Amino acid sequence: MSKLIGEPVKVHRNKDSTLTSFIWRKRFYRVDEVISWWREPSEWWNGKAMRLFVRVNARNSSTGTYELYKLGEEWFLHRVLD
């Protein structure tokens, strides 16, 4: 199961551009593992850019799996996986 979110997040990356943490709803999540990266078109019929997705294991008070995506210069939490 998963829950679609679609809310903006603030992402932190190291100097190698690896995702290290993100802030969602004023809560800090530390990324323990980057599981995968991929690209998907975003409303190609409107000329919008590709979205860069990343699936991570991250923790706040407990560990979870999250999918985030970057569209332009902005990052969003796409879904939370159970």
Task: Write out the residue ranges for each language-model feature.
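N- and C-terminal low-complexity/disordered segments
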Residues: 1-82
